[in-house]
């Protein structure tokens, strides 16, 4: 696919996630799609919880679901996106952190995604406090 088409694909993926449009999200993925999160997080590695199960309780509003994706680089088969993750705990504590995602694209669909947090410790700390209350 072209660079422009891949840029659009990446932004469409983020739009589907922000809008919680699971059907559209699945349409944008290859059947063998792989997702890789840091193993130190509750949804990383081979842990049972998913990103959605972990974060959706803390992203009830549109503000928290907004990811502000910015395509940093894109080629014919991969892209890098800088995006923000937000959440609010039941006690009102707010979290906002930046990530870089490395995305592989094959046949016009997302094949692989790997996330790199700028501060994994802050994410883990927020989740621990937010779920222990």
Model-derived features: where do they sit?
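Short, low-complexity N-terminal intrinsically disordered segments enriched in polar/charged residues
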Residues: 1-31, 129-133
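Hydrophobic pocket/interface hotspot
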Residues: 10-13, 24-26, 33, 50-51, ...
């Amino acid at each position: 696919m072209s660079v422009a088409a891949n840029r659009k694909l990446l932004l469409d993926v983020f739009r589907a996630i922000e809008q919680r449009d699971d059907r559209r999200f699945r349409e944008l993925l290859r059947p063998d799609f792989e997702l890789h999160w840091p193993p130190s997080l509750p949804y990383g590695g081979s842990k049972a919880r998913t990103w959605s199960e972990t974060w959706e309780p803390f992203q009830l509003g549109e503000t928290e679901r907004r990811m502000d994706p910015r395509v940093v680089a894109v080629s014919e088969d991969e892209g890098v996106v800088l995006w923000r993750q937000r959440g609010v705990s039941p006690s009102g504590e707010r979290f906002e952190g930046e990530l870089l995602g490395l995305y592989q694209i094959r046949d016009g669909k997302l094949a692989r995604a790997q996330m790199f947090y700028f501060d994994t410790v802050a994410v883990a700390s927020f989740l621990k406090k937010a779920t222990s209350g």
